[in-house]
């Protein structure tokens, strides 16, 4: 689960950048 956190954080950052 911990290994997924960086991936999720990157996805959120990408979405924030897109918006």
From Swiss-Prot:
<comment type="similarity">
    <text>Belongs to the frog skin active peptide (FSAP) family. Phylloseptin subfamily.</text>
</comment>
<dbReference type="GO" id="GO:0050832">
    <property type="term" value="P:defense response to fungus"/>
</dbReference>
<feature type="modified residue" description="Leucine amide; in form Phylloseptin-2.1TR">
    <location>
        <position position="19"/>
    </location>
</feature>
<keyword id="KW-0964">Secreted</keyword>
<dbReference type="GO" id="GO:0042742">
    <property type="term" value="P:defense response to bacterium"/>
</dbReference>
<protein>
    <recommendedName>
        <fullName>Phylloseptin-2.1TR</fullName>
    </recommendedName>
</protein>
<keyword id="KW-0204">Cytolysis</keyword>
<keyword id="KW-0878">Amphibian defense peptide</keyword>
<keyword id="KW-0929">Antimicrobial</keyword>
<keyword id="KW-0354">Hemolysis</keyword>
<keyword id="KW-0044">Antibiotic</keyword>
<dbReference type="GO" id="GO:0045087">
    <property type="term" value="P:innate immune response"/>
</dbReference>
<keyword id="KW-0399">Innate immunity</keyword>
<keyword id="KW-0391">Immunity</keyword>
<dbReference type="GO" id="GO:0031640">
    <property type="term" value="P:killing of cells of another organism"/>
</dbReference>
<dbReference type="GO" id="GO:0005576">
    <property type="term" value="C:extracellular region"/>
</dbReference>
<keyword id="KW-0295">Fungicide</keyword>
<keyword id="KW-0027">Amidation</keyword>
């Amino acid at each position: 689960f911990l290994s997924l956190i960086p991936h999720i954080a990157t996805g959120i950052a990408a979405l924030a950048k897109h918006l």
